[in-house]
Amino acid sequence: HLSIRRQRQMCIRDRTYILQEFGKQEYDHVAYINCDGNSEIANIFAEDYDMKRVLMVIGAISKQPIIPGKTLIILDEIQELHKGLSSLKYFCENAPEYHVAVAGSLLGVAMHQGESAPVGKVDIIRLYPMSFEEFLMAKDEEQLLNILKSKDWKTITLLHDKLTKILREYYFVGGMPEAVKTYLATNDANLVRQVQNNILTIYRSDMSKHVSPNEATRISMVWQSIPSQLAKENKKFIYGAVRSGARAKDFEMAIQWLVDAGLTYRISRVREVGMPLKFYEDLNAFKLFLLDVGLLGALSEMEPAQMLISNKAMTESKGAFTENYVLTQLLCQQDIYTYYYSRGDARLEIDFLAQHLSLIHISEPTRP
């Protein structure tokens, strides 16, 4: 059984496309059901986990034959189903011959709030925004990508201007598939920003789901503070920058919600540079980054032309976009554990420490 966690609006069409294309290529039938707002399936697991009944209902709703090994069952937005995640255990134990894939935009939040995918019963895949490498491929720049991978520094230096231009494009567009698709199809920066703003609107709507109005307000306050937090010379998250006089207890649940939802990444400071980095983690000092550098520009209300042409925006942001970019590229790699280091006197800082077999120190220039 396969579970896909994804950032909200990864987008829905892209996630659905991936699952359905996989089903079309590998199976004779695809029984797809979107569980969000679907009253027909809302209480399918409320009474019991009778798999014979459950499979019959899925077949009736999807209008597809449910055949072992030949039908892929896809339950989209499974977090909207009562006991939906828990049901995967019973699919695995009582109906192992049936193939099931599930997906959702707030699975991390659902798991944190009590529901969880059964241990050992589910393979979990997390989808990230498109990386710079994937952006180059989408632009049909495979040759340029191969040169970068070759580490032929002389050739790379000769191509500096072209690489810088494309990197600026990526800083602006980011890796959200709908934004990339719009940019490549129209070359219209204003339409791209409209797509990004639509995504941010959906995020804000999500922030009011499954939490109290008071907690939703706190989540929104933390979210809106991230651009200004990252535009500081010292990017350590400051609670007082969210609300004057605020303390950790006021906003720690809001931060955890954003992390669980996959909308932000929390990168902790380490007190010393040593392996494993986890031994030296300082839980009281951390930075918060957005899931996508393009959305950071939109949330910051940065004019598209400033990002695509001007250096002023990059220098005034004090490396916010560059650090967010580097982190998102690191996190696309598997098994990369990322922290940062700073001395108490703040005179020495390593922007990122990545642990992968050995320690990798990464410090960023201010602009691309």
Language-model segments: residues:
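Single conserved hydrophobic/aromatic residue that forms the stacking wall/gate
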Residues: 1-8, 12, 360-368
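Hydrophobic positions on the alpha1 helix immediately C-terminal to the Walker A/P-loop
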Residues: 18
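Conserved catalytic segments around the Walker B and adjacent sensor/switch elements
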Residues: 26-40
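Short glycine-rich substrate-engagement loop in P-loop NTPases that contacts/grips substrate
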Residues: 38-68
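Conserved P-loop NTPase "ATPase switch" module shared by AAA+ and STAND
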Residues: 66-82
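Structural recognition of the conserved hydrophobic beta-strand(s) that form the central parallel beta-sheet
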Residues: 99-105
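Interdomain motor-coupling "hinge/lid" segment immediately C-terminal to the ATP-binding subdomain
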Residues: 112-231
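Accessory nucleic acid-recognition modules appended to NTPase machines
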Residues: 184-358
